[in-house]
């Protein structure tokens, strides 16, 4: 067969007979098998070096899946990363670079679910990564964000705004450092640039127009609202960062030189006198000079590119304003078309009103940035020249704006047409919008242009006054705008009648009850600012507002009512009262004098219920009181001794009262003295005793209680005070000692003191231990050779001295609270016995041991032994040697029937050493008093 014939046989068609099946081919594939899918929920092989999630995937596995072509795999990898990093947070620091590079790369992914997972992961990671850690990688993050914001896909642009929200919240300083690129991106999100040849030579403000994208799922107005909200947040972060930078400029870092600071120097004179406080007067007076440098570390933008100035330069700010303001005006016109404008007073729907609010917020922030850089007011003039006409035409034509709410009626009457019901409400939207607009407009006005702008300024003034007087509840943001506009109006139009009207309107709002703390604080600061401005003027041009005087006069009463219910607000009131009192404001001082009894009440007054800092300011206010009557001094004394004031504040109060007394050395006439000498001495003695007359009277009925020490040899019982009360009383008494010591005529001073002791303390049967100790202390301080001690006082001192010594000798080791009193009380007892030998003799004469029970006899013996051993008393003990010898003899007689104890042996030994063994002998020293 030829080759040609063979080729033909290959292509011959096989003829099949009817009813017979087609024969199977030799290479036919069987298709009768069944298949099942294989699902691997986790890896079989585990990696022990890296932590894994519930699917046994570690960080490297998950990051590698980010490059997969399938969107579901990438989404699963992002969710797995979130799960893994939530279980093992330490992985973030180790793999931060890889995590950020992979996560930010999917900002522009075409799948919406992948982008959503990336945004959720970034929101989870951002709070866990510090700004210092993020800073090296932020150029990469910013580049991907910029790429997403300028992407041609609408969904990617929308998701980029979510990423921007996260970065603005967590890293405002880093994101605003890239402002040059991001601000341009904001512009491109809502507009496009005209590239026609006719616009080449025109300015840049006319080359950008709003863009409309019909393919976007949102309306053009909704999309612009989203972008404008983010732009407002971005400019707010930029303004905050710029203000912080300006505050820190030129100041030395505290870490570099802790001695150099711009704050006030607080000097504690007590510590300074003891060389415990170092005071550096001059900033560069230390060993480390202040090096003020303008050097700043720039961001790692790569290459040799310069620092991103953004809007920090005036030229850049002007350029951005020229581009964005026309676009914002277009947004405004789109929200409120002039051809469809309803009459003034009719409402605007919520969505257009929100667009208008964001437009004004952005303009207000741009104005704020311009004020931070406009030192010569050139930029302010430029803004007025270029934009005042447009603002008046578009913004003020329908001022003020209101919100229209659409209410749907029920279809009960189908024949009647359903009409929209317009509802006016004091909603935050329209009120804040009107206030922001007022703030922008008044910033463009000044005193020189008042005649030209009087029409729209009067509109704003009327709106501000009505808003303040209508009694509506304002939040702090609204009130801050409102007070800012009011202040600016008073500056540009310093008319007394108009200013008084505005102040009266603010005072009407201030008188409302139930205002929240931020609102009340803003009102206080506003009035304080007005008052300080008035005080800075010369007396010739000073205008005292009647409303302001009424406000000042009401502050002390407000403080008395407020008390501790709001300590922060009370502190602000005290600061304002202190400022006005220091300037001798008559109305305030008169009101403060009338309210002083309530403020300085020892039970519920502000001086005892507030924290330490406002307490100190209230104590300082005592210096400015016009008069200090006896009832007020009595309350101040109770404040000192009750422990509600610290001992240092009590000492400060005592020092202030001394400075306002006739003994301070100031040359006053008798009618100008704030308090009489009798009242001043009464205050000092009441503070010295530490207890009121009523409290001492109640103590006299105490018997047989653990806090009362009773002896068989002394008629005076000792009341044991708590340790805290004892120490506080002791510290306060030190200040009383100092005030008494500086009073001239020491003998007269001592006579007044011992007369008070004889009148109020002598005759009492129960005396507090702190009172007895302080009385001994003040007598020892004041006693000199010119002083004569009263005969009625000596027995009382002797009885108190024995009671104190008995208490000290019977303190058990377990009573740690009373052990801390031992040194102080022992010192004053020994001092009083050394200075007044007659007190020692009277105490020895009272030791009639035949009346003493067996439990008190060892205490008497121990007391005699200690008195003999104490060097300052040795001479006086020699003088009373016969009396001491008789007491020891009586003790020995009482103990003759039993075995001699150790304390009696020690007593005999000390008597033989210090009395019998003395060269002169006891018989030669027998002196009869």
Swiss-Prot record:
It comes from the Eukaryota. Keywords: Cytoplasm, Nucleus, Phosphoprotein. GO terms for cellular component: cytoplasm; MLL1 complex; nucleolus. PROSITE patterns: HEAT_REPEAT. The keyword Protein transport does not apply. It is found in: Nucleus, Nucleolus; Nucleus, Nucleoplasm; Cytoplasm. Pfam families: Ipi1_N (PF12333). InterPro entries: ARM-like, ARM-type_fold, HEAT_type_2, Ipi1_N. The modification Phosphothreonine is found at residue 29. HEAT repeats lie at residues 99-137. Functions as a component of the Five Friends of Methylated CHTOP (5FMC) complex; the 5FMC complex is recruited to ZNF148 by methylated CHTOP, leading to desumoylation of ZNF148 and subsequent transactivation of ZNF148 target genes. Component of the PELP1 complex involved in the nucleolar steps of 28S rRNA maturation and the subsequent nucleoplasmic transit of the pre-60S ribosomal subunit. PANTHER family: REGULATOR OF MICROTUBULE DYNAMICS PROTEIN (PTHR16056), TESTIS-EXPRESSED PROTEIN 10 (PTHR16056:SF2). Component of some MLL1/MLL complex, at least composed of the core components KMT2A/MLL1, ASH2L, HCFC1/HCF1, WDR5 and RBBP5, as well as the facultative components BACC1, CHD8, E2F6, HSP70, INO80C, KANSL1, LAS1L, MAX, MCRS1, MGA, KAT8/MOF, PELP1, PHF20, PRP31, RING2, RUVB1/TIP49A, RUVB2/TIP49B, SENP3, TAF1, TAF4, TAF6, TAF7, TAF9 and TEX10. Component of the 5FMC complex, at least composed of PELP1, LAS1L, TEX10, WDR18 and SENP3; the complex interacts with methylated CHTOP and ZNF148. Component of the PELP1 complex, composed of at least PELP1, TEX10 and WDR18. Belongs to the IPI1/TEX10 family. This is Testis-expressed protein 10. It comes from Pongo abelii (Sumatran orangutan).
């Amino acid at each position: 067969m030829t080759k040609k014939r063979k080729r033909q046989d290959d292509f011959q068609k096989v003829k099949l007979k009817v009813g017979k099946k087609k024969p199977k081919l030799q290479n036919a594939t069987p298709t009768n098998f069944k298949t099942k899918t294989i699902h691997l929920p986790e890896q079989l092989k585990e990696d022990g070096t890296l932590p894994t999630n519930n699917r046994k995937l570690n960080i490297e596995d998950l990051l590698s899946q980010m490059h997969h072509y399938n969107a579901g795999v990438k989404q699963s990898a992002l969710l797995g990363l979130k799960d893994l990093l939530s279980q093992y947070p330490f992985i973030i620091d180790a793999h931060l670079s890889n995590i950020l590079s992979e996560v930010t790369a999917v900002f522009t992914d075409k799948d919406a679910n992948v982008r959503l997972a990336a945004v959720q992961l970034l929101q989870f990671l951002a709070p866990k990564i510090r700004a210092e850690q993020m800073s090296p990688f932020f150029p990469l993050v910013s580049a991907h964000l910029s790429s997403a914001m300028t992407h041609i896909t609408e969904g990617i642009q929308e998701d980029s705004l979510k990423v921007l929200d996260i970065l603005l919240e967590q890293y405002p300083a880093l994101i605003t450092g890239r402002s040059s690129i991001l601000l341009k991106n904001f512009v491109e999100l809502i507009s496009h640039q005209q590239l026609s040849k006719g616009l080449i030579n025109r300015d840049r403000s006319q080359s950008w127009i709003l863009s409309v994208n019909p393919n976007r799922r949102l309306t053009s107005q909704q999309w612009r609202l989203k972008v404008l909200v983010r732009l407002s947040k971005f400019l707010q972060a930029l303004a905050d960062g710029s203000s912080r930078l300006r505050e820190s400029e030129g100041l030395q870092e505290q870490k570099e030189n802790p001695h150099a600071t711009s704050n006030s120097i607080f000097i504690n004179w007590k510590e300074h006198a003891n060389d415990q406080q170092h005071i550096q007067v001059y900033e560069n007076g230390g060993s480390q000079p202040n090096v003020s440098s303008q050097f700043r570390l720039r961001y790692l933008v790569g290459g040799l590119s310069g620092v991103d100035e953004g809007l920090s330069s005036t030229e850049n700010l002007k350029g951005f304003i020229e581009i964005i303001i026309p676009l914002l005006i277009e947004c405004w016109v789109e929200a409120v078309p002039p051809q469809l404008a309803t009459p003034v007073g009719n409402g605007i729907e919520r969505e257009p009103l929100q667009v208008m609010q964001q437009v004004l917020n952005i303009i207000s922030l741009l104005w704020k940035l311009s004020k931070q850089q406009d030192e010569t007011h050139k930029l302010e003039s430029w803004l007025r020249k270029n934009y005042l006409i447009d603002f008046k035409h578009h913004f003020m034509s329908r001022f003020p704006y209101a919100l229209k709410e659409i209410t749907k009626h029920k279809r009960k009457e189908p024949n009647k047409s359903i009409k929209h019901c317009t509802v006016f409400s004091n909603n935050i939207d329209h009120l804040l919008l009107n206030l922001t607009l007022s703030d922008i407009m008044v910033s463009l006005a000044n005193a020189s242009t008042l005649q030209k702008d009087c029409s729209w300024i009067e509109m704003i003034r009327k709106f501000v006054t009505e808003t303040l007087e209508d009694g509506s509840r304002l939040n702090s943001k609204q009130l801050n705008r409102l007070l800012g506009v009011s202040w600016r109006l008073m500056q540009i139009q310093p008319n007394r009648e108009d200013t008084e009207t505005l102040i009266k309107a603010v005072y009407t709002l201030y008188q409302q009850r139930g205002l929240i703390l931020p609102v009340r604080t803003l009102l206080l600061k506003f009035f304080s600012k007005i008052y300080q401005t008035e005080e800075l003027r010369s007396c010739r041009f000073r205008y005292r507002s009647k409303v302001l005087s009424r406000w000042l006069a009401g502050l002390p009463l407000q403080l008395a009512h407020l008390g501790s219910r709001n300590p922060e607000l009370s502190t602000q009131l005290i600061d304002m009262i202190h400022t006005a009192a220091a300037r001798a404001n008559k109305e305030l001082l008169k009101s403060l004098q009338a309210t002083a009894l309530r403020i300085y009440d020892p039970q519920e007054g502000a001086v005892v219920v507030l924290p330490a800092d406002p307490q100190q300011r209230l104590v300082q206010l005592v210096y400015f009181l016009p008069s200090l009557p006896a009832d007020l001094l009595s309350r101040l004394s109770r404040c000192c001794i009750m422990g509600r004031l610290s001992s240092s504040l009590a000492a400060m109060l005592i020092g202030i009262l001394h400075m306002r007394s006739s003994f301070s050395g100031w040359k006053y006439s008798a009618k100008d003295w704030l308090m009489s000498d009798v009242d001043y001495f009464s205050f000092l003695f009441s503070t010295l005793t530490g207890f009121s007359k009523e409290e001492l009277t109640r103590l006299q009925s105490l018997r047989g209680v653990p806090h009362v020490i009773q002896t068989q040899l002394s008629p005076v019982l000792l009341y044991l005070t708590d340790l805290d009360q004892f120490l506080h009383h002791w510290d306060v008494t030190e200040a009383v000692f100092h005030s008494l010591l500086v009073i001239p005529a020491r003998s007269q001073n001592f006579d007044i003191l011992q007369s008070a002791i004889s009148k109020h303390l002598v005759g009492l049967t129960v005396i507090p231990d702190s009172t007895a100790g302080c009385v001994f202390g003040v007598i020892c301080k004041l006693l000199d050779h010119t002083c004569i001690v009263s005969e009625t006082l000596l027995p009382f001192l002797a009885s108190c001295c024995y009671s104190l010594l008995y208490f000290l000798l019977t303190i058990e080791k377990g009573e740690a609270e009373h052990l801390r009193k031992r040194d102080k009380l022992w010192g004053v007892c020994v001092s009083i016995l050394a200075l007044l030998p007659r007190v020692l003799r009277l105490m020895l004469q009272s030791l009639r041991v035949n009346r003493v029970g067996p439990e008190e006899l060892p205490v008497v013996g121990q007391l005699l032994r200690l008195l003999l051993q104490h060097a300052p008393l040795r001479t006086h003990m020699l003088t009373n040697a016969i009396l001491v010898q008789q007491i020891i003899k009586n003790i020995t007689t009482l103990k003759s029937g039993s075995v001699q104890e150790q304390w009696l042996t020690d007593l005999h030994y000390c008597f033989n050493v210090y009395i019998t063994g003395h060269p002169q002998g006891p018989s030669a020293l027998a002196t009869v008093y």
